Amino acid sequence: GISLFYNLGKGKFKEKKLLQFSPVFGASYFELADFNNDGYPDIVLTNGDNWDYSRTNKNYHGIRIYLNDGKYNFQEQWFFPLYGTAKAIVRDFDNDGDPDIAAIAFYDILEKPSNGFVYFSNEGNFHFKPSSLPNAALGKWLTMEAGDFDHDGDTDIVLGSYFHNIEEMRSLIGTVDILSFPQLL
C-alpha cells in the first residue's frame, strides 16, 4: 500500500494509509503528479511485479491514476492493463502543457515485445493515446529515468535493459546480431 506520514516533530510521525492492496496486487512503483490541475498531488501507480507469488499474467496488472480529493483521499480514475508493468514516469513529454506517461513492462516482454515501453500522450479528460517505438521492442526494459540528458531543453527518456542469459536474449531479438541490441535506449 501507500501511506502518508505527517511529521509531528521530535522524531514522531502520524501515518495515514492512502491506498491498500493485497500482496498479489504486485505494486511496483508510484509517482505523484497533478492530473486535474486542482493543486493537489494525484498518484500514478504501476502494478506488475509478477514473480513473488505467481508467474502468470494478471488482468489487473497495469497503470493506474488515483485522484486526490483535496483531503488526501484517493479514488481510481484511470486504468490501462499492461502485464508486468514495472514503472511509469509522468512528465509533459510533448510540451503541450499536460502530463503524459511513459511506462515500461518487464515480464510479458517475450510474448509482446512492443509492450516493453509504451508512451501515453495525454489527449485530455483522462484519455491517453498509447504508442510504442520500434527500437524499444529489442530491449527487455527493467529501469527508466527521465531528464534533459542532452541539454536541448526538452525531456528525454533513458531505458535500461536486463537479460537473465544469452538464450533469453536470442529469443527476444531473433536473428538480429546479439551485439547490436540496445542495452540503453
Q: What does each model-found stretch correspond to?
A:
Residues G1-L185:
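Beta-propeller-forming repeat regions
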